[in-house]
């Protein structure tokens, strides 16, 4: 998500609930705010009865979803949104256009990642997600953990 955003969040909030064991959250809701105005909402749960790995992006012109559990249509792009009407202030016209799904390889992501890592070790090339990427992810995870421990108080990243 950080790569897609092109920036790190400036604020992270998390709230969770422990149902099975005290101190270990089974369900967590997160909110990330970015300097550009971008926001991300996450729902994380190992306890949820439905296994989901879905990512939704809502943009000003189109929307897209990535669903890793889907076999045929992992990515779906929606030409859907709202266009501002200039007849009067604050009016919007709903726009709903085409929906399409580009063909995406059905290879297992972990296999691709491991193969790429081994190739980089052998060739000396830099991996697509190197140590800097890992540091950025851990920084966000630590901020979310701090927020979780402080009852969803916003934590600087």
Task: Describe these PLM feature segments.
Residues 3, 123, 140-143:
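Residues within well-ordered alpha-helical secondary structure of globular protein domains
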Residues 131, 135-138, 142:
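C-terminal interaction segments
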């Amino acid at each position: 998500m950080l790569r897609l955003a092109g920036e790190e969040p400036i604020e992270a909030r998390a709230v969770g609930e422990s149902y099975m064991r005290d101190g270990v959250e089974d369900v967590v809701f997160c909110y990330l705010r970015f300097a550009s105005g971008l926001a991300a909402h996450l729902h994380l749960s190992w306890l949820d009865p439905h296994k989901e790995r879905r990512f939704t992006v809502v943009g000003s012109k189109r929307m897209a979803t990535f669903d890793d559990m889907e076999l045929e249509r992992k990515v779906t792009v929606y030409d859907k949104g709202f266009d501002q009407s200039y007849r009067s202030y604050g009016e919007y016209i709903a726009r709903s256009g085409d929906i399409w799904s580009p063909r995406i390889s059905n290879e297992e992501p972990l296999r691709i990642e491991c193969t790429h890592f081994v190739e980089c070790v052998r060739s000396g090339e830099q991996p697509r997600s190197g140590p800097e990427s890992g540091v950025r992810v851990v920084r966000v995870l630590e901020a979310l953990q701090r927020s979780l421990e402080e009852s969803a108080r916003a934590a600087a990243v």
